[in-house]
UniProtKB/Swiss-Prot annotation:
Residues 8-290 form the tr-type G domain. NCBIfam families: EF-G, PRK12740.1-5, small_GTP. The keyword Oxidoreductase does not apply. SMART domains: EFG_C, EFG_IV. Coiled coil: none annotated. This is Elongation factor G. One of its GO terms (cellular component) is cytoplasm. Its main location: cytoplasm. It is found in: Cytoplasm. Pfam families: EFG_C, EFG_III, EFG_IV, GTP_EFTU, GTP_EFTU_D2. GTP binds at residues 17-24, 88-92, 142-145. CDD domains: EF-G, EFG_III, EFG_mtEFG1_IV, EFG_mtEFG_C, EFG_mtEFG_II.
Length: 704
């Protein structure tokens, strides 16, 4: 079956931005103008087509990126029909993972900025991610009808803060309440959209006299930018000082595709102005799948390879998102890089080493779906029937195996305990958490061996709130959520010799075990460089403790280590040497010596200056210079030790060691100190002694 749309006419794009820049509204307008949705869904009514999870409609934010396919032939029907696959991405920092995944499979992006707020913290994160994957992009400065909106100021911020070479291709006519339309700097005409039909039609009129000079200045800058694309264009420009419309398009396109410039458009999606011009920009300036470099991959032997975007190449696709659908079960969203996949075909997953059959293939329009027979290079679609696929896996032809690069996912930074409210919820909870963890690699689930509790970890407090919320709504599981917990430990600080005697004689056979044990701090590490928990040494001479009982003494000490001596936390870093003792021919037994060993530790550890240890985290905070003092002051208040400072393009990097107990609520706190512009990551570094005043509180609360 031949292609319906030639590959050159495909555009796989993402719409990304900071929370509240208006990106979902922009996507809604795109669907309206391209004829897919007949009534525009407003976000503040909770009716937007792309926000299909209940939590999204309630909170008015986008959590998971929905994928949609639509067609566009231009504002003036000047193009052949182009197929645009759109992925709407979340802008909240707790969901950065969704943005990262989307950018990984896109060929181009439209980054939306708010006309009054300009470049906000999450826009810096999104921009960094787009740079990481080399995604060509155009900019839409939205909300030009908002008070304080200023198109040129936002363009200047993008230049200075994001270090991007911005080239405006439009200029706004009026702003705030007086925002009327835009000047097209290529055609040098003003575009006025018709308000009666929600901006479906427009008029081209002359540029207002007061804006003529500024429009001409910006046009010259734009033509210079286009001319730098090639020597021929530059020669022509230097000879005549002008380029034709086609040459301008050609030059701008070449430079956008090379990530040398970023074109800026403006408008107000909510007021139905400017979105169709952005769609024209997507078709004109963003790449088709076969106009980006061939996807890099590896063969099964780890040799570097690549796959061209072609139907004739062997099949290769990346599973970039999993979702559970109430009607069809598991949906696996894939981006096809090469070859053809028909429903019913078998695919090979080299990451898992498994072969699976694709049941059906559907094209998603937000959460509505159309069944299709096949997908080809460049397509984005969802497969039904794959059981063993996780995010980031490759699907390919078993005869021609390649592994597309793995996606890197960040380590979770916050954990809480969850427990089902009733016995009936217990089994449902583990199924629900398993499914949610398969969908979202930045969310982890584990069982705490000490407490037996289920611990969930994620990218932030909002992230975990939404997980608990989804358990309740989608899986009907009610759960209690605990406060974040810290895994403390205990140890000893000095050397001590301890005698312990366990004697029971009450008629018949008694019990007799008698030992002398030396306890001291153990400063040894294992082959992984981790501190050793326990070491037992046998120095018994002359059989005063018979060989068959020595293992029991060690066992008794080790079991008591798990229960601690101060607050019931496991002990680590203890060396025990058995050097003397005595036995009874009839009454001694393994049990008696085991109990004697455990008594020796219990008594000895108290004399050996036992103390409580806490996990210390290695914390890295990236912050703009303006907030450096506040961020460092806050880390000091959290008992942090600043180890050093670095610089990177996003600002200053602070490296510190901070107790985990002081890091709860930090994500929210650092966000408010830096107005959301600082970001942080942390990982476990070591255990260290807790200050006495805090240790006393811990012991008191554990023993009460």
């Amino acid at each position: 079956m031949p292609r319906n749309t030639a590959l050159e006419k495909y555009r796989n794009i993402g719409i990304c931005a900071h929370v509240d820049a208006g990106k979902t509204t922009t996507t809604e307008r795109i669907l309206f103008y391209t004829g897919l949705s007949h009534k525009i869904g407003e976000v503040h009514d909770g009716a937007a087509t792309m926000d299909w999870m209940e939590q999204e409609q309630e909170r008015g934010i986008t959590i998971t990126s929905a994928a949609t396919t639509t067609f566009w032939s231009g504002m003036d029907q000047q193009f052949e029909k182009h197929r645009i696959n759109i992925i709407d991405t979340p802008g909240h920092v707790d969901f950065t993972i969704e943005v990262e995944r989307s950018l990984r499979v896109l060929d181009g992006a439209v980054v939306v900025f708010c006309g009054s707020s300009g470049v906000e913290p999450q826009s810096e994160t999104v921009w960094r991610q787009a740079n990481k994957y080399g995604v060509p992009r155009i900019v839409f400065v939205n909300k030009m009808d908002r008070s304080g909106a200023d198109f040129e100021r936002v363009c200047a911020q993008i230049k200075t803060r994001l270090k991007a070479n911005v080239v405006p291709v439009q200029l706004n006519i009026g702003a705030e309440e007086d925002f009327k339309g835009v000047i097209d700097l290529i055609r040098m005409k003003a575009i006025m959209w018709n308000e009666e039909d929600m901006g479906l039609t427009y008029e081209l009129v002359d540029i207002p006299a007061d804006l003529q000079d500024r429009a001409e200045e910006l046009r010259m800058e734009m033509i210079e930018a286009a001319a730098e694309a090639s020597e021929e264009l530059m020669e022509k420009y230097l000879e005549g000082g002008e380029l034709s419309e086609d040459e301008i398009h050609q030059g701008l396109r070449a430079r956008v595709l090379n990530n040398e410039i970023v074109l800026a458009f403006c408008g107000s999606a909510f007021k139905n102005k400017g979105v169709q011009a952005v769609l024209d920009g997507v078709v004109r300036y963003l790449p088709a799948p076969n106009q980006v470099p061939a996807i890099k991959c590896e063969t099964e032997d780890g040799e570097p390879a690549s796959r061209p975007s072609s139907d004739d190449a062997p099949f290769a696709a990346l599973a970039f998102k999993l979702a559970t659908d109430p009607f069809v079960g598991n949906l696996t969203f894939i981006r096809v890089y090469s070859g053809v996949l028909k429903s019913g075909d078998a695919v090979y997953n080299p990451v898992k080493g498994k072969k699976e059959r694709v049941g059906r293939i559907v094209q998603m329009h937000a959460n509505k779906r159309d069944e299709i027979k096949e997908v080809r290079a460049g397509d984005i679609a969802a497969c039904i029937g794959l059981k063993d696929v996780t995010t980031g896996d490759t699907l390919c032809d078993q005869e021609d195996v390649v592994i597309l690069e793995k996606m890197d996912f960040p380590e979770p930074v916050i954990s809480v305990a969850v427990e089902p409210k009733s016995k009936a919820d217990q089994e449902k909870m583990s199924i629900a958490l398993g499914k949610l963890a398969a969908e979202d690699p930045s969310f982890r689930v584990k069982t705490d061996e000490e407490s037996g509790q289920t611990i969930i970890s994620g990218m932030g407090e909002l992230h975990l709130d939404i997980i608990v919320d989804r358990m309740r709504r989608e899986f009907k599981v009610e759960a209690n959520v605990g406060n974040p917990q810290v895994a403390y430990r205990e140890t000893i600080r000095s050397k001590v010799e301890q005698e312990a005697k366990f004697v029971r004689q009450s008629g018949g056979r008694g019990q007799y075990g008698h030992v002398f044990v030396r306890f001291e701090p153990l400063d040894e590490v294992d082959e992984n460089g981790e501190a050793k928990v326990f070491k037992f040494v046998d120095e018994v001479v002359g059989g005063v403790v018979p060989k068959e009982y020595i293992g029991s003494v060690a066992k008794g000490i080790e079991e008591q280590l798990n229960n601690g001596v101060l607050a019931g936390y496991p002990m680590i870093g203890v060396k025990a040497t058995l050097y003397d003792g005595s036995y009874h021919d009839v009454d001694s037994s393994e049990m008696a010596f085991k109990i004697a060993g455990s008594m020796a530790l219990k008594e000895g550890a108290k004399k050996a200056n036992a103390c409580i240890l806490e996990p210390i985290m290695k914390v890295e905070v990236v912050t703009p210079e303006d907030y450096l003092g506040d961020v460092m002051g806050d880390l000091n208040r959290r008992r942090g030790i600043i180890e050093g400072m670095d610089e990177n393009p996003s600002g200053r990097v602070i490296n510190a060691l901070v107790p985990l107990a002081e890091m709860f609520g930090y994500a929210t706190n650092v966000r408010s100190i830096s107005q959301g512009r600082a970001s942080f990551s942390m990982e476990f570094k070591k255990y260290a002694e807790v200050p006495n005043n805090i240790a006393d509180e811990i012991i008191k609360s554990r023993n009460s």
